[in-house]
Amino acid sequence: MTSATSPIILKWDPKSLEIRTLTVERLLEPLVTQVTTLVNTSNKGPSGKKKGRSKKAHVLAASVEQATQNFLEKGEQIAKESQDLKEELVAAVEDVRKQGETMRIASSEFADDPCSSVKRGTMVRAARALLSAVTRLLILADMADVMRLLSHLKIVEEALEAVKNATNEQDLANRFKEFGKEMVKLNYVAARRQQELKDPHCRDEMAAARGALKKNATMLYTASQAFLRHPDVAATRANRDYVFKQVQEAIAGISSAAQATSPTDEAKGHTGIGELAAALNEFDNKIILDPMTFSEARFRPSLEERLESIISGAALMADSSCTRDDRRERIVAECNAVRQALQDLLSEYMNNTGRKEKGDPLNIAIDKMTKKTRDLRRQLRKAVMDHISDSFLETNVPLLVLIEAAKSGNEKEVKEYAQVFREHANKLVEVANLACSISNNEEGVKLVRMAATQIDSLCPQVINAALTLAARPQSKVAQDNMDVFKDQWEKQVRVLTEAVDDITSVDDFLSVSENHILEDVNKCVIALQEGDVDTLDRTAGAIRGRAARVIHIINAEMENYEAGVYTEKVLEATKLLSETVMPRFAEQVEVAIEALSANVPQPFEENEFIDASRLVYDGVRDIRKAVLMIRTPEELEDDSDFEQEDYDVRSRTSVQTEDDQLIAGQSARAIMAQLPQEEKAKIAEQVEIFHQEKSKLDAEVAKWDDSGNDIIVLAKQMCMIMMEMTDFTRGKGPLKNTSDVINAAKKIAEAGSRMDKLARAVADQCPDSACKQDLLAYLQRIALYCHQLNICSKVKAEVQNLGGELIVSGTGVQSTFTTFYEVDCDVIDGGRASQLSTHLPTCAEGAPIGSGSSDSSMLDSATSLIQAAKNLMNAVVLTVKASYVASTKYQKVYGTAAVNSPVVSWKMKAPEKKPLVKREKPEEFQTRVRRGSQKKHISPVQALSEFKAMDSF
């Protein structure tokens, strides 16, 4: 315990003339101005006018004398009131009086003879001495203020120690009441000191320390009370000791900030922009070199080392558990692209060595290098946003589960959930640090790191509070202690969330949120179809959480813009999502869960749920479109989710060559791209025929609104997958390996099976036997061509690349034919298998397997794949038409009320909306939409003082 008589140690050199507060600066400024003006009188040398006394100089000298007298009076008053610095203040006052008298004499003599350089020099020396003396007096007065603050701190420390030593709850209440009174006084004095501090860092430290003191004082009472009530529970002591330590650190922080001796941000590790962002920035600067001074031996190792360091950081992010597979592949691909761009750039520098100016190829290489690093940044930002979107979703759930377990008194369960809560907290901190690593916002990064540090230290104490409650579930004191720590945790998580949101891009957030909601919508639909209630409930909750985050963040973002057309459009979109779309979605989720959870599953309208889910996705997409309305083309390009396919995604251990050799480890897509030109031409002919069939399907499905019509939805899905498969035969598209082609064929088969089920239901309701037979015949074609597509894709899978040469294994076709009916019996039943097998295409069987030309085998395999896709496309077109015709026959017999049967709903698609008036040019519109300045809260006292200051001029 600190003794009441122990001296207060001031960490401040009294001899220092460093000005640390705005008050000292403000008081000193008029005197400096007056002295400077006096010194500069007749500065330009002797005047041509009649010599005589300068009235202006005498007036200035008098004003300096009066100002000095004012300082003396104030200094004497402060010296009388001060206890700790009385001697120093008295000595400083006497020094000011002495220097003031010297200045009075020197200025008077100079005013009488302003042209005398000797008298002017004497006055300049006297002025300097006077300013030094006055500055020292003001600094000592400032020190006296700090000493008063330190005295308050000492009293608070003693009151804190008294609270810690309380022996019972009544004693604790009395001592805490005294502690609260002293806290109020300290806060007032510290707030005044904070306003006066000149250094922004010290002001921030003072504000942070005051905030920490206020925050922890709330927990101090409940933690101490819990310890006194349940001293046998070890967790209560841990809680109390933690809070006391936090309060002591806050008091020390106020002391350090008041004396401007706070540890720097560098010492705390909170300073600077993100490490990866800084490395990328530095790399972008280093690649701009002078060809005249370029030396490969000097610059190549340096640039390559810097790039590999960046790629190592990117690889860590790519390998993180929350990074999605497609994002991981894109990051790896961008890293390879950046590597290649650097080699190309260095080659161009070597070609331009010794030249005064950079040639066009070199400038192009520099631009390409910059673009590739920008693309890598974008993928890293999106990867981080993936993490943020997943980790900062429903952040209170682990805490609530932990508290519920604690209330039940199940200590074993509490320990299990405590581990989950700890992992959740660690994940928040990890993701926050990831967000910092790629951010250029220095102040924002500092806030995130500070908030993450608080989360890290608070997590164990929340668990201790839960353990206390679990040990004494009936104790109101334990419950109150838990509530206080719960509130503190939730506040700190909100602070961290807002800080992370501030250093991340709204555009990236919307792009990733849109993708994640689409993923979750698909999961919901699958869970609904499979009757998985738990997955449906959990995923629907995630959708609601993501949508709520979108609404909150966008509404907050719009507060930074001046009200206008732009903000109105964005806010309309958020309002529609929050007030119309989400309530409908929640209602449909509730209906679906009730129906699936019943003892006997109840029928419900599945299409209604799918429509409600789709509207959520559409709502988020509309918000994103509205937000991007004022973006520049460059910003839109940087935000684009479109991934260039000008590189091949390889594993990090694969061999890479400068030319287009066929090498082990290449993807099958790359192999297809390297076929001879004549083979490519033949494939192109087949693709052209396929596109003709595709255009027919596009024209057919474009007529219909796909909401409530799963036949149209499935037709679109099958068309998209078939396009990807035909792109694969040309060495393009998202399918990279033969396994991807097989999976795509399986997806088509699954979609075909679902379409078969729907269309058969339509056929069953059709009263016209001719229409019914036509529809069933087309469905047989779909089953047949799905079967063909599966076979062709699997025969294609047997094409291998060995030793740099393409060969086709001899057992591929036979094994595919013999196993197909066992693997894909869901496509066509065994009874129709023998009937359909006679119509199967010759999938590469025209060429002798293993003995003919490998290119010919590849060509046959590719053309068979395209032919099967074309046939399937045609069958889908005919099925869509026949399904509609069958529905119209049903309508004619049973009436118009039954046209939208329970199977599918046939509604004409509404035409696209067109503007009634000509749109303004984007550049003209953009000039009127500008970001508003941040709202500043000005206190009435400050406003009044500024008004008085203006009135005084």
From Swiss-Prot:
Alphabetical list of SUPFAM superfamilies matching this protein: alpha-catenin/vinculin-like
Biological process terms in GO annotation = axonogenesis; brain morphogenesis; cell-cell adhesion; dendrite morphogenesis; modification of postsynaptic actin cytoskeleton; negative regulation of Arp2/3 complex-mediated actin nucleation; prepulse inhibition; radial glia guided migration of Purkinje cell
Which residues are reported to carry the modification Phosphoserine?
Answer: 640, 651, 901, 939
Phosphothreonine found at? 632
UniProt tissue specificity = Expressed almost exclusively in the nervous system.
Q: What happens when the gene is disrupted?
A: Mice generally die within 24 hours after birth. They display altered Purkinje cells migration, unstable synaptic junctions, defective ventricular architecture, impaired axon migration, reduced number of neurons in specific nuclei, and disordered laminar formation.
Instruction: Spell out the note in the miscellaneous section.
Output: The cdf (cerebellar deficient folia) mice are viable but are ataxic and have cerebellar hypoplasia associated with abnormal lobulation of the cerebellum. They also display defects in Purkinje cells positioning and in packing density and lamination. Fear conditioning and prepulse inhibition of the startle response are altered in cdf mice. Those phenotypes are associated with alteration of the Ctnna2 gene which results in the C-terminal truncation of the protein and are rescued by expression of a Ctnna2 transgene (isoform 2).
Q: What is this protein called?
A: Catenin alpha-2
> What is the organism field in this record?
Mus musculus (Mouse)
